[in-house]
């Protein structure tokens, strides 16, 4: 069976060439990352089928999109490469929350890293509960730390931390 017999959305490089690197499907680990349908995902379950009469063992991958939380599944021969995203996490202090002129859009965040560098290009997270938690902590006068995850050209606030956890 050739690769053309499969619809591997995670093959090739395309626009994500420098945002991913290849790894043998059989080398993936639970808790690691993989691209499925062009989306960066965290692996939550892996299973390997036995080698069949046509050669390769198959790896079944169950993962969640790191930005949306959607569950995705894929399969690949264990010896074939899949794309793995470069995932980076950063912790920032929230300096200010500026409401958007359009109330239907998320508020903008003013953030500062440990070196004192500021940035104002991120919005409140789409997760309403997390956005509310950030706003309530900020409004109460507490120092608010947010964890920003960056992968495949997307950056998003995914959680808050206590200042003591820094």
From Swiss-Prot:
Annotated Acidic residues bias: 112-122
Keywords: Cytoplasm, Elongation factor, Hypusine, Initiation factor, Protein biosynthesis, RNA-binding
Biological processes, Gene Ontology terms: peptidyl-lysine modification to peptidyl-hypusine; positive regulation of translational elongation; positive regulation of translational termination
Positions bearing Hypusine: 53
Molecular function GO labels: ribosome binding; RNA binding; translation elongation factor activity; translation initiation factor activity
Record CDD domains: S1_eIF5A
Record note on modification: Lys-53 undergoes hypusination, a unique post-translational modification that consists in the addition of a butylamino group from spermidine to lysine side chain, leading to the formation of the unusual amino acid hypusine. eIF-5As are the only known proteins to undergo this modification, which is essential for their function.
Cellular compartments annotated: Cytoplasm
One GO CC term, this protein: cytoplasm
Region Disordered, residue ranges: 1-20, 101-122
Domain of life of the organism encoding this protein: Eukaryota
Pfam families for this protein: eIF-5a (PF01287), IF5A-like_N (PF21485)
Family, as annotated: Belongs to the eIF-5A family.
Biological role: Translation factor that promotes translation elongation and termination, particularly upon ribosome stalling at specific amino acid sequence contexts. Binds between the exit (E) and peptidyl (P) site of the ribosome and promotes rescue of stalled ribosome: specifically required for efficient translation of polyproline-containing peptides as well as other motifs that stall the ribosome. Acts as a ribosome quality control (RQC) cofactor by joining the RQC complex to facilitate peptidyl transfer during CAT tailing step.
Protein name in UniProt: Eukaryotic translation initiation factor 5A
Source lineage: Eukaryota, Discoba, Euglenozoa, Kinetoplastea, Metakinetoplastina
């Amino acid at each position: 069976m050739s690769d053309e017999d499969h619809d591997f959305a995670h093959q090739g490089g395309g626009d994500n060439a420098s945002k991913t690197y290849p790894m043998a499907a059989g080398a993936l680990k639970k808790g690691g990352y993989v691209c499925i349908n062009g989306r960066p995902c965290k692996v939550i379950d892996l299973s390997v089928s036995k080698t069949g009469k046509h050669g390769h063992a198959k790896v079944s991958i169950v993962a969640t999109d790191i930005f949306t939380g959607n569950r995705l599944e894929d399969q690949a021969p264990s010896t074939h490469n899949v794309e793995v995203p470069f995932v980076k996490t950063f912790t920032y202090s929230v300096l200010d929350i500026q409401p958007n002129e359009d109330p239907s859009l998320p508020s903008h965040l003013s953030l500062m890293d440990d070196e004192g560098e500021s940035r104002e290009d991120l919005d409140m997270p789409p997760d309403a509960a997390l956005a509310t938690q950030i706003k309530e902590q900020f409004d109460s006068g507490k120092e608010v730390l947010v964890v920003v995850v960056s992968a495949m050209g997307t950056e998003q606030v995914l959680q808050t931390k206590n200042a003591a956890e820094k």
